[in-house]
Design a protein with these regions (language model features):
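N-terminal glycine-rich FAD/FM-binding segment characteristic of electron-transfer flavoproteins
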Residues: 1-159
Length: 159
C-alpha cells in the first residue's frame, strides 16, 4: 500500500498520519511546497511530487503515470492499494485517480488491508467489510487509525 497525500502550500491535511501509518510509512506527497515538509519519525519513505497549485485532473494524470510506471526505485512497496486521506482534496483527487488507474474507489474507509476494506455507511451506524479482487484506490477517514512512529529520517525521493 502507498499513501498519496495532497499538499497545499506546505500544509498537510487532516488524516495524513493515519494514511501514512496504514501504508507502513510509504507516502507520496503531491502538490505545492512539498520540499518544505519534514516527516521525520512519521514516515519510512517519502516521494515528493511538486505539481504546484491544485488542479485535480492534472494531478491525477501525473500520479497515474507515476503509479503505472512505478518500480521499487521510484515508489517503494506495492502500488496496488493507493490510500488518500478523506480530506477535501483527497476526496476530490481519489475518484479522478481511480478513473485514471481504472480501479474501483472505496471512499470513507475506516480500515484497510490488501484483501479487505471496511467502510462506514448509514451515517456511521453500519460497518461494511468489502473484499476487493484486485488493485484499488481508497480514502481513509481521519482519526480512525492514528499515527505510527518510524525511527529517524525517512528516505526521500524527488520525482
Amino acid at each position: 500500500m502507498i499513501a498519496v497525500v495532497p499538499v497545499r502550500e506546505s500544509v498537510l491535511p487532516a488524516g495524513t498520519d493515519d494514511a501514512i501509518a496504514e501504508c507502513d510509512g510509504n507516502v507520496v506527497l503531491v502538490g505545492s511546497g512539498v520540499d518544505d515538509i519534514d516527516l521525520t519519525d512519521r514516515a519510512r519513505t517519502v516521494t515528493l511530487v511538486d505539481l504546484g497549485d491544485v488542479e485535480i485532473a492534472r494531478w491525477a494524470r501525473h500520479l497515474a503515470a507515476l503509479i503505472n510506471s512505478a518500480d521499487d526505485v521510484v515508489l517503494p512497496g506495492s502500488t496496488d492499494q493507493v490510500v488518500l486521506p478523506h480530506c477535501p482534496d483527497g476526496r476530490d483527487l481519489a475518484p479522478a485517480l481511480a478513473l485514471r488507474l481504472s480501479r474501483p474507489l472505496y471512499a470513507g474507509a475506516t480500515a484497510l488491508a490488501h484483501d479487505s476494506v471496511f467502510v462506514a455507511r448509514s451515517g456511521g451506524r453500519e460497518l461494511h467489510e468489502l473484499r476487493p479482487s484486485g488493485a484499488f484506490v481508497a480514502t481513509l477517514q481521519p482519526g480512525i487509525r492514528g499515527a505510527a512512529s518510524f525511527d529517524g529520517h525517512p528516505e526521500v525521493r524527488r520525482v
